[in-house]
A protein has these predicted regions:
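Residue-level recognition of membrane-helix boundary sites in multi-pass small-molecule transporters
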Residues: 21, 53-54, 84, 113, ...
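Transmembrane alpha-helix termini and helix-breaking/packing motifs in multi-pass membrane transporters
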Residues: 43-47, 101-106, 162-182, 254-255, ...
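C-terminal transmembrane bundle of multi-pass solute transporters/carriers
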Residues: 67-68, 79, 85, 89, ...
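Small-residue hotspots at the loop-to-helix junctions and early N-terminal turns
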Residues: 39, 49-59, 150, 260-267, ...
Length: 418
């Protein structure tokens, strides 16, 4: 059946057996991940009497390892067996989620437990992300890389569609514990899926010999103004604009005075938009159009502002899918551009630096957003995040307006000689 998939179609990456295995397992993992995110936020609000500052701190602690370890994860991605490394990172993530679930169900959990386990999960996630990103090209080959990235994003956001609603109903019926246990199980499933991959069906990449250092990766980026433009845009758009998780929790509880089920529905609403954005991206190849990314971020910033001024819960929920669509088209375009236009020999390190840019500001931004929401309210905080995103996109467009193309030769040697 899969051999008949159109080689030019939206689902062409599913022709690869290894990709099908990972894709199926990732669906369960993505549902579990989003279920845990909702449950963890709700647990923090329960333990701290709806204090947004604590919510920001927990988010920051989970992303702090990204700031400290994502670049090292990128170095590992260029040196180690990626499949074996991903088995280890998912085992660690599963144990972390299992521990939080058991502590919660036995009713001994406190905010310190959440802090510690958020850091542990963050450590494994920080190492996993650049290795997994660099591994995709080995699973499907470079011709199908962009399509595989888009389908993975669609998978992730389908999980975002199901996970929050599932978690909302589980919280209402049984409390937050079951969501953590589901996530633990999902990590163990994808761990075994990596073990089931056939090594002889992986696509070996021709890799030139390089230093293998972060210094070399930074020198490469210094010569690539197209990559600089994307990193500048994404740093501000992701670390300030992409805070719907915190925004939704605070708007649901403090502005619209809703319960767990309604909060979970907001996560589903934004997932409708992000899933649509991922499927649209699977049809379009923008890997040769770097200027599209700051333009997309500009559009995204406008829809973040629309969230800030939404007068009712219903209107807020209706704006979320559009916000999600604009966010996803921005982020997936940036991610696929970085992978498709980085040399094989340095891709892991470039993606490690990109992950740092993408999420590394969260440990700083999340507490600030949580604190600001306590001082000036969620609406003004969201408006401020929108303003920062808009300004960053405009600055990137102005500074790099003449850098809208990919170099003819992206090899490490050629770029460093230029």
């Amino acid at each position: 059946m899969f051999s008949k998939i159109n080689e030019e179609g939206n689902w062409r990456s599913l022709r690869h057996r290894n990709f099908r295995i990972l894709y199926a397992a990732a669906l369960l993992t993505n549902i579990g991940t989003w279920a845990q995110r909702i449950a963890q936020d709700w647990l923090v609000l329960e333990l701290t009497h709806n204090n947004g500052t604590y919510l920001g701190i927990v988010t920051a602690l989970q992303f702090l390892p990204v700031m400290l370890l994502s670049m090292q994860g990128g170095v590992l991605a260029d040196k180690v067996n990626k499949k074996k490394a991903l088995v280890i990172t998912n085992l660690g993530s599963g144990i972390s989620a299992l521990a939080l679930g058991l502590l919660t169900i036995t009713k001994v959990v406190n905010i310190d437990h959440v802090y510690i386990l958020a850091i542990l999960l963050g450590i494994f996630s920080a190492l996993d992300a650049p290795i997994r990103s660099a591994f995709i090209v080995e699973v499907v080959g470079k011709p199908d890389l962009t399509n595989a990235m888009s389908l993975n994003s669609a998978n992730f956001h389908f999980g975002r569609l199901i996970g929050p609603t599932l978690s909302g109903f589980l919280i209402a019926a049984f409390g937050t514990g079951p969501s953590f246990l589901i996530n633990a199980f999902s990590f163990f499933v994808i761990m075994f899926s990596f073990m089931a991959l056939r090594d002889d069906e992986l696509h070996e990449q021709k890799i030139e010999k390089t230093e293998g250092t972060l210094k070399e990766a930074f020198a490469y980026i210094k010569k690539r103004r197209d990559i600089q433009m994307i990193m500048l845009t994404i740093f501000f758009a992701s670390n300030f604009g992409l805070n719907a998780q915190i925004f939704n929790a605070l708007m649901a509880t403090k502005v619209f005075h809703k319960g767990a089920a309604s909060y979970g529905f907001l996560g589903t609403a934004i997932a409708v938009g992000t899933l649509t954005g991922a499927l649209v991206s699977a049809r379009k190849d923008r890997t040769k159009r770097p200027l599209f990314i700051p333009l997309a971020a500009l559009n995204f910033g406008i829809w973040v502002m629309a969230l800030a001024i939404a007068p009712t819960y219903l209107i807020y929920a209706l704006v979320l899918p559009i916000n999600g669509f604009s966010a996803l088209t921005t982020m997936i375009s940036a991610n696929t551009y970085m992978q498709a236009n980085s040399d094989n020999a340095i891709r892991g390190r470039i993606m490690g630096i990109y992950m740092f840019i993408f999420m590394g500001g969260t440990p700083i931004g999340s507490p600030l957003i949580g604190y600001a929401s306590q001082q000036i309210g969620p609406r003004w905080t969201i408006a401020g995040c929108s303003f920062i995103t808009l300004i960053a996109a405009l600055v990137a467009l102005f500074i790099y307006r003449n850098d809208g193309k990919v170099p003819e030769d992206i090899s490490v040697a050629a770029v460093l000689r230029s």
